[in-house]
Amino acid sequence: MVILDETACQNTPNTSRVLYESGSKNVIAKIPDRIKINMIGFQSINCKSYVEATKKSNAYTFLISLCNFRILNSENEECCKLINEAINHPNLSEKNIKKEISKNLSSEYDLINKINDKLYDDNSKEKSINSIRRICNKEDPNNKAKIERRKRININKNLENPKIKELTNKEKRINLVLDNARIHTAKMIEKAVEILNINLISLRPYCPDLSPIEDVWRVIKKTTYKTKYNSANELINLFKDKYYEIIESKSFYENWLDQNDINF
């Protein structure tokens, strides 16, 4: 059983608070630049816990985190190697994806014809401009949406290696409790968890307090708020150190297990 959640941590709190002692004022040293990190944590009850920083919060980065957690909790070395190769394959680099996209783009001659067709077909000048803009975006190899879409396609293909599923099915099945965030219910995630032998168990909607990992976040943020650091990397390391220091404490999830009649 594993409880998963994402959180953001920053050096500037969302709410301003002034802390006073008798006859004096507490001053907490903070660097002037805003530092913010996104973290995803796996609070494990009967396997290895894990936490990592993520640059973005989307289905693709969530899938990478699931794969890293599966690797950590797999005994077969070949299984770990194949999953690691799948998520670090050259076909996932932005440079190679741009090359891949460029192969399917229209020739310069065809592109000019497409633009000319839209330029003279529409009665409205505004419609013509919008149509031409869409064509140019579609034909742009640097189009971010296109690159992200191709990344998702490629990583799913990489994981569809039959050997990966064969080996993960021999590993201990992971039951993962998480909220109903949109990225957790994406189709690419549904396909991936089947391959990785992970069972997703959703909490009731709009009930984040039902997740015991929320208490873990509170303890960590109390520490980061009182500690001085000078960069995002220092904050990430501080967060990870505190996470692994406290995550094994049963006090975070014992009541939650009792309330849900879960026995281990």
What kind of feature is each model-predicted range?
Residues I213-F264:
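C-terminal anion-handling pockets and recognition modules
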Residues K125-D140:
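Major-groove recognition helix of helix-turn-helix-like DNA-binding domains
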Residues L178-N180, I201-T223:
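RNase H-like two-metal-ion nuclease catalytic core shared by retroviral integrases
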Residues D5, K81-N88, K95, T168-H184, ...:
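Acidic/histidine-rich, metal-coordinating catalytic segments
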Residues A86, N91-Y109:
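Short, amphipathic alpha-helical "recognition" segments used to contact nucleic acids or chromatin
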Residues I97, Y109-N123:
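DNA-recognition alpha helix
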Residues D5-T7, G41-Q43, L66, I115, ...:
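Generic structural signal for small/hydrophobic residues in well-ordered secondary structure
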Residues M1-L72, N76-C80, N84, H89:
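Extended, low-complexity cationic-aromatic segments
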